[in-house]
């Protein structure tokens, strides 16, 4: 699989969010590879977007990586326990990002099962199998993504997104999830998901 280059990420988050669908997120951990096919994303358009951490040009140590240019990871924690993985888009100084909300397991399902449920994959029931990666926090836990990977270069060899040959995709557009604080921005249709995937977090 071909790794995505910097130019892929150096575009508006709305474009990148759609085009990440069907791509494969890969994390190489001490010689072991875990990967998952991206099936749900959300675009955050930075300074103009009331749902974005960088809205209004907000610049704190937490969001600094969003200002650093395209193709880097932005990992933050919610509720004090769940990590969320984002890819930074647009040029330096234009703090946009795409949240990866859900994915379908590809490689390393045994490690994912241990990370999520402390069980072997063959011990999981159907609900647990779908629950491996069908939400942003679940995805991060399954793929061993945490705060230590904040700012990771996604054009490197440790954490990256790769192309996968695929047929045409049926993409659904919807409102983003869990941003009721964002006033009118909570209604923007900036969430995208694959219609036929069972791993989408919310339909």
UniProtKB/Swiss-Prot annotation:
InterPro entries, A to Z: Formyl_transferase-like_C_sf (IPR011034), MPG (IPR003180), MPG_sf (IPR036995)
Q: Name one GO biological process term.
A: base-excision repair
Protein origin, superkingdom: Bacteria
Q: Which Pfam families match?
A: Pur_DNA_glyco
Please list which residues make up the signal peptide: none
Query: What EC number(s) has UniProt assigned to this enzyme?
Result: 3.2.2.-
Q: Which UniProt keywords apply?
A: DNA damage, DNA repair, Hydrolase
Q: Does the keyword Protein transport apply?
A: no
Q: Which GO terms describe its molecular function?
A: alkylbase DNA N-glycosylase activity; DNA binding
Report the top EC class in one word.
hydrolase
Q: Which family does it belong to?
A: Belongs to the DNA glycosylase MPG family.
Kindly provide the name given to this protein in its UniProt entry.
Putative 3-methyladenine DNA glycosylase
Source species: Desulfitobacterium hafniense (strain Y51)
Lineage per the UniProt record: Bacteria, Bacillati, Bacillota, Clostridia, Eubacteriales
């Amino acid at each position: 699989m071909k790794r995505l280059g910097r130019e892929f990420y150096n575009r508006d988050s709305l474009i990148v969010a759609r085009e990440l669908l069907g791509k494969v997120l890969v994390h190489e951990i001490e010689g072991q590879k875990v990967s998952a096919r991206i099936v749900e994303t959300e675009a955050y358009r930075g300074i103009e977007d009331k749902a974005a951490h960088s809205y209004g040009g907000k610049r704190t140590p937490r969001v600094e990586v969003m200002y650093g240019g395209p193709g880097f990871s932005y990992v933050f924690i919610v509720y004090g326990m769940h990590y969320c993985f984002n890819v930074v888009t647009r040029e330096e100084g234009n703090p946009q990002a795409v949240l990866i909300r859900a994915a379908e397991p590809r490689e390393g399902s045994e490690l994912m099962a241990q990370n999520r449920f402390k069980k072997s994959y063959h011990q999981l029931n159907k609900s647990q199998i779908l629950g491996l990666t069908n939400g942003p926090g679940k995805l991060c836990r399954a793929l061993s993504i945490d705060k230590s990977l904040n700012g990771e270069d996604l054009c490197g060899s440790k954490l990256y997104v790769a192309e996968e040959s695929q047929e045409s995709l049926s993409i659904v557009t919807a409102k983003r999830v869990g941003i009721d604080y964002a006033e009118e921005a909570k209604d923007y249709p900036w969430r995208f998901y694959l219609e036929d995937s069972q791993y989408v977090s919310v339909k």
